[in-house]
């Protein structure tokens, strides 16, 4: 049987504080999935960033 087309897609979340601060050693990214039907807009989650050392907002990137 053929597999049905899934509405879940893989996305990357990037730390906004690391991106704005140029003197950081790197940029933190998380990989997760989301359901395109339920959340069509870009996802924003508050997650821990090891480069910043505290919880920051992570936004979805392409």
Swiss-Prot record:
Name used for this protein in its record: Large ribosomal subunit protein bL33c
Pfam family, one: Ribosomal_L33
GO MF terms, alphabetically ordered: structural constituent of ribosome
KW Ribosomal protein (keyword) present: yes
Cystine connections: none
Primary localisation category: plastid
Signal peptide: none
Family from the record: Belongs to the bacterial ribosomal protein bL33 family.
Annotated GO biological process: translation
InterPro entries attached to this UniProt entry: Ribosomal_bL33, Ribosomal_bL33_CS, Ribosomal_bL33_sf, Ribosomal_zn-bd
Lineage: Eukaryota, Rhodophyta, Bangiophyceae, Cyanidiales, Cyanidiaceae
Subcellular location: Plastid, Chloroplast
Organism: Cyanidioschyzon merolae (strain NIES-3377 / 10D) (Unicellular red alga)
Domain of life: Eukaryota
Record has Ribosomal protein as a keyword: yes
Any one Gene Ontology cellular component term annotated for this protein: ribonucleoprotein complex
The entry's keywords: Chloroplast, Plastid, Ribonucleoprotein, Ribosomal protein
């Amino acid at each position: 049987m053929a597999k049905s087309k899934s509405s879940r897609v893989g996305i990357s979340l990037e730390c906004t504080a690391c991106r704005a601060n140029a003197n950081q050693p790197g940029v933190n990214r998380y990989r997760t999935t989301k359901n395109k039907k339920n959340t069509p807009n870009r996802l924003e989650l508050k997650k821990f960033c090891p480069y910043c050392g505290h919880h920051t907002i992570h936004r979805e990137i392409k």
